[in-house]
Amino acid sequence: MKELVNILDFLPEELGEKIKPMFRVKQIYQWIYQKYANNFSDMSSLPKDLRLELAQNFHFSPVKCVKNEQSKDGSIKYLFELIDGLRVESVLLPMKEEKIDTEGKRISHARYTICVSSQVGCKSSCSFCLTAKGGLKRNLSAGEIVGQILWIKKQNNIPYERRVNIVYMGMGEPLDNLKNVSKAVKILAQNDGLAISPRRQTISTSGLAKQIKELGQMNLGVLLAISLHAVNDELRTELMPINKAYNIAAIMDAVREFPIDQRKRVMFEYLLIDGINDKLEHAKELVKLLNGIKAKVNLILFNPHEGSLYKRPSLENAIKFQDLLSSKGVTCTIRESKGLDISAACGQLKERAKEQ
């Protein structure tokens, strides 16, 4: 039996090499990403013989949802099974956004962020992260990354044109899978597809300096987030062994070279761990470290998980840390940890084995 190819892996120009004429590719993209077709036979504007040809050569179901859990805060965690049986998790984070209409009335509507995985597992071995405990199984293809987003939007009846933010902060180190992640960014940005601007896509990294430079040279227009979590190499190496390969100085050099929109900032994620990196002296060092960089600091309170040796700091200490940074002119927020009750928060995702 012929092995079917995942059509979500293809950019329009690549699909155009297999399907003629090109306007048919545009129609196929619209059926998949905008009309949320369930199968090729749904694509009624295509000739019957083309629909048959597509069904004989392609599929567009690279992920299958086997479980979902909804948090009391509205977040939904999805467990996806891939074609080879491996599993990844993704999270939908709905948020309310308020605006003033032309009559001066306050109106609110849903704004969505989707946190996607880029690998099955991770090899970075960060001591505070549950994902790393199982090691790295493999990279996801571009289509498997895109498939998570497409399935979540379709399942939640989110119109394709509705504004959505994508954060590559799920399972895996995105820059360790740069080829497929960068391709996913391009596929998601297609006007005949989901039309998610690169400016709404944030790639998070544990600090692979070489790949940060490579990403910058691609000029994709994406946002960059650095998982920093420590202000000196000794502590960072203890928390994040990847620091042995790319120390803080190397990361900062790469960040300074990274092209960023004038209206945007590089995000630095800083996980506050009780008694480890949450003292005011750490905050002072962080201010020095970010000098000259157009940065925004996102403080995250450690999210406990099974087997963890670390503790979550008090909100009071986090606010003191934030206040010091703000007083020195550093833009800083404390991230609200969503999905804690369903293990969907930062550092809590993992490849969950099949239930026996």
From Swiss-Prot:
Radical SAM core domain ranges (all copies): 108-341
Any single GO BP term: tRNA methylation
Note on cofactor: Binds 1 [4Fe-4S] cluster. The cluster is coordinated with 3 cysteines and an exchangeable S-adenosyl-L-methionine.
SMART domains per UniProt: Elp3
Catalytic residues (UniProt): E89 (proton acceptor), C346 (s-methylcysteine intermediate)
Cofactor or coenzyme needed: [4Fe-4S] cluster
Additional remarks: Reaction proceeds by a ping-pong mechanism involving intermediate methylation of a conserved cysteine residue.
Protein name: Dual-specificity RNA methyltransferase RlmN
Species in which this protein is naturally found: Campylobacter jejuni subsp. doylei (strain ATCC BAA-1458 / RM4099 / 269.97)
Originating gene: rlmN
